[in-house]
Amino acid sequence: MVYLVGAGCGDYDLITLRGLELIKKCDVLIYDSLIDKELLEYAENAEKICVGKRSGAHSETQKTINSLLIEKARENKTVVRLKGGDPFVFGRGGEEIIALKEGDIPFDIVPGISSAIAVPELAGIPVTHRLTSRSFHVITGHTAEDILPENMKAY
């Protein structure tokens, strides 16, 4: 079984209770570089594998990470894939569940707090407000071609 767990953004205590419990019980912890390293201490008996990726600096390819998830799950190990923020907000969680489905590996998702929500909130800025904004948009600074549209309006 593989659990894709969002670590939240920033401090270790922003992870969900469910995410923390899974870290404590897992056999293998496969983690990104953007997590608070204090979370690693909760996986006392787990095999810990860093697969951290940042723009332009990848310790492992996504294909290698996907294969590692499948390999460890096929060894009948409980695997936590710990990702910064939320697994499905620019976290490649979608790519990982596609690989798990193709490998016939059971999985579950534990959402995390995305910086897209947390940063403005911690600064006291609501991302929506009934009187001024009914929606908000999250846009990456990186595209497949590393080019943002020139016609994107700023508000």
Where is each model-derived feature located?
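Class I S-adenosyl-L-methionine
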Residues: M1-A7, Y12, L17-I113, A118
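Beta-strand/loop-alpha-helix module characteristic of Rossmann-like adenine-cofactor folds
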Residues: M1-V5, F107-D108, A116-Y155
